[in-house]
């Protein structure tokens, strides 16, 4: 009976981990603070590119 409880807990942990793994990874950064802004496409000339803030939007920094 103890081993049955152990397997139920193990199954719960495995399913719980699989649910978290199925989500897509987050590659987007938070932008819009301390001199940064989010703009569609590429950053305007004279601004530094920092990364993506959402799909097809660039996170830029004022220079």
From Swiss-Prot:
Signal peptide: 1-19
Molecular function GO terms recorded: CCR6 chemokine receptor binding; chemoattractant activity
Keyword Transcription regulation: no
Cellular localisation: Secreted; Cytoplasmic granule
Keywords carried by this UniProt record: Antibiotic, Antimicrobial, Defensin, Disulfide bond, Secreted, Signal
Gene Ontology terms: biological process: cell chemotaxis; defense response to bacterium; defense response to fungus; defense response to Gram-negative bacterium; defense response to Gram-positive bacterium
Organ and tissue specificity: Strong expression in the bone marrow and testis. Widely expressed. Weak expression in the ovarian stroma, but not expressed in the ovarian follicles.
Disulfides per UniProt: 31-59, 38-53, 43-60
Family indicated by similarity: Belongs to the beta-defensin family.
Task of the protein: Has bactericidal activity. Potent activity against S.typhimurium and S.entiriditis.
Stated name of the protein: Gallinacin-4
Species assigned in the record: Gallus gallus (Chicken)
Lineage: Eukaryota, Metazoa, Chordata, Craniata, Vertebrata
């Amino acid at each position: 009976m103890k081993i049955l409880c152990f397997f139920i807990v193990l199954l719960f942990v495995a399913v719980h981990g699989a649910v978290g793994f199925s989500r897509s990874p987050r590659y987007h950064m938070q932008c819009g603070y301390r001199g940064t802004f989010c703009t569609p496409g590429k950053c305007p000339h004279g601004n530094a590119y920092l990364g993506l803030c959402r799909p097809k939007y660039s996170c830029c920094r004022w220079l």
